[in-house]
A protein has these predicted regions:
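N-terminal Rossmann-fold NAD(P) dinucleotide-binding loop
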Residues: 13-14
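Central helical "cap/lid" subdomain
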Residues: 36, 147-198
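A conserved short coil-to-beta-strand element within the FAD-binding core of flavoproteins
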Residues: 121-136
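Glycine-centered tight beta-turn/hairpin loop motif at sheet-sheet or coil-to-beta transitions
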Residues: 140-142
Length: 206
């Protein structure tokens, strides 16, 4: 049994950690407060929150479709039947385009497949060393941990900074620009006032 460390709790990191855990010891680390990565969920209280990463998933491959259908049967995912506006005038809308979301949030996939994995959140990997055929990892809280195997699923900028000393493949030297994305998240309280309800409905369709 090997001792693995996986950096990143998005769908890729969570899937890798889950598969490796069948025959190995696995720890997973992420800088965020919880799992999800690019499909993270921003909670504003115990009952409400926002999907501020992935809006939905639309499985294409047969293997992924089977996995998604399995999670739908387990009531972890569901079909998104809300009202959607297709605004791309240069492309024809696919009326049969399937939209799948988490029942509680789009990080439900990661949460489900990581439920039996040792996860450490709000912990950033700052430095990697390789000594005596082991990976020595230094984290933002000053802790150092040693692993036989290391898998990085973090964004490219972080990956390049941490691993360029060890990865000799040409891709690591590429300059990948990641554009900032501004997301506005707001909630509206329900009201019994007819005029206020009408104003909200009008604003939603402007």
């Amino acid at each position: 049994m090997s001792r693995y460390c996986v950096i990143g709790s998005g769908i890729s990191g969570a899937t890798i950690a889950n598969l490796l855990s069948e025959k190995n010891s696995v720890d997973l680390f992420d800088t965020a407060k919880g799992p999800g990565g690019r499909s993270s969920f921003k909670r504003i209280d115990k009952a409400k929150g926002f999907d501020h990463g992935t809006q939905y998933i639309s499985p294409k491959s047969l293997a992924f479709k089977k996995f998604v259908n399995f999670l739908i049967k387990k009531k972890i995912l569901k079909k998104w039947r809300g009202i959607h506006l297709f605004l791309n005038k240069a492309k024809k809308e696919n009326k049969n385009h399937l939209k799948i979301i988490g029942r509680k949030g789009n990080n439900d996939i990661s949460k489900n497949i990581l439920k039996n994995i040792n996860c450490y959140f709000q912990t950033e990997l700052k430095k990697i060393d390789y000594k005596d055929k082991k990976w020595v990892l230094t984290f933002s809280d000053g802790n150092r941990k040693i692993y036989e195997k290391l898998i990085l699923t973090c964004p490219f900028a972080q990956l390049s900074k941490l691993s360029k000393e060890f990865i000799k493949a040409p891709f690591i030297k590429k300059k990948v620009k990641m554009d900032a994305n501004i997301t506005v998240m707001f909630s509206i309280k329900k009201t019994n006032n007819k005029d206020e309800r009408q104003l909200i409905e009008e604003k939603n369709f402007e």
